[in-house]
Amino acid sequence: MSEEEGRERAVTVEGDAESMNDGRALVQPPARSGDVITPTRAVLTLSKSMFNAGCFSLPYAWKLGGLWVSFVMSFVIAGLNWYGNHILVRASQHLAKKSDRSALDYGHFAKKVCDYSDIRFLRNNSKAVMYFVNVTILFYQLGMCSVAILFISDNLVNLVGDHLGGTRHQQMILMATVSLFFILLTNMFTEMRIVSFFALVSSVFFVIGAAVIMQYTVQQPNQWDKLPAATNFTGTITMIGMSMYAFEGQTMILPIENKLDNPAAFLAPFGVLSTTMIICTAFMTALGFFGYTGFGDSIAPTITTNVPKEGLYSTVNVFLMLQSLLGNSIAMYVVYDMFFNGFRRKFGARFPNVPKWLSDKGFRVFWVLVTYLMAVLIPKLEIMIPLVGVTSGALCALIFPPFFEMITFWTDWKGLLTYRQRMTKIFINLVVMAIGVFAIIAGVYTNIHAIIQSFSQPDP
């Protein structure tokens, strides 16, 4: 073999080894510039996307599931979410590198998975898969934003409802309408740097409000020895749905990773994802445990309404309403990030004389109004939260990531892993997907039952 042929073969082998990459040894990507954020701000933004209205319904979720069943399930759900988020980012980074893209959002990632697949059916229907993923994420984000409106409305009614007439349902609609104006204002900003600043300010309000709630909660007589360890199937499934919703940052994973100045910091051992998951799991477990053991069967659908309305405690509602107001723009950012470019291209081609700023703001106003209508149609936190969490939440956390990972690395695993290692990975992913399918089927059934029961009862 000549020296030139030897060099060519060395380059070919090196290229093959690089292409067969299951994500364990990604080449250090170049630093990004422009509208980017640091790892610290990424942790704050991702934590804020999880620390939201759903957290304060966790004590109520523990009541539905039972004390010790809920305690165990909290760690199981956290672990499943962490696993799904980790393999999602790993596969996304791999495909972004493979397709010479700096980053991929969830929908285009799903399309790339199918485009590079060995399965002809997936290659021929890659756009359909992308649309399905996008619609799922759209429903998830809109559900989260409608929950934020409900949370604000619920706390406003808790503060001033005694001075208003009408039923609680009418009061909730009135307060949702009042909050709509302020939510529209916070959704007029487009850059991740501004959105992450909102997340920072929102986190301050959240920490203050959560600290006051925890301080009041731990002062209550502890009832842990009197509470049931488990309840029933329906209650447990509803608890799982509400806990899945509490980890509502699944759809923010890729948008934040895409804006990180150093992408390698996201999956590092003490990087953005692991740090965020540890913080969130510890806080959510503590809030659920102490909230339920402190108030017992009297715990409300959101623990903020168990706190007194006078003195320092009355400010808790205000702080948490402000954090939900600012946090709403974080959740809606995903919708704008995924759909606006396509909308602007098609809308601009059909209506070229409409100013770009008008189409931009009109697009944002439209989706905010959709979340408002969702909140008005189902103005009950205890129904909306598990409904969103157990459907779109389970799809985004438990079904899409393992499915896409297997398709992405299927060929690479054959060349890099032993048969036993490959079968172990496939088995783990299939188990996670089976859990997700079961959660969706059981969750939809229990939530439909809860909706029928709720609306068949007279409104107080």
UniProtKB/Swiss-Prot annotation:
Major location category of this protein: membrane
GO cellular component, one term: vacuolar membrane
The organism's place on the tree of life at top rank: Eukaryota
Topological relation to the membrane, as annotated: Multi-pass membrane protein
GO biological process: amino acid transmembrane transport
Distribution of this protein across tissues and organs: Expressed in the head, tail, body and ventral nerve cord neurons, muscles of the vulva, and intestine.
Family affiliation: Belongs to the amino acid/polyamine transporter 2 family.
Protein name according to UniProt: Probable amino acid transporter skat-1
Organism per entry: Caenorhabditis elegans
Encoding gene, per UniProt annotation: skat-1
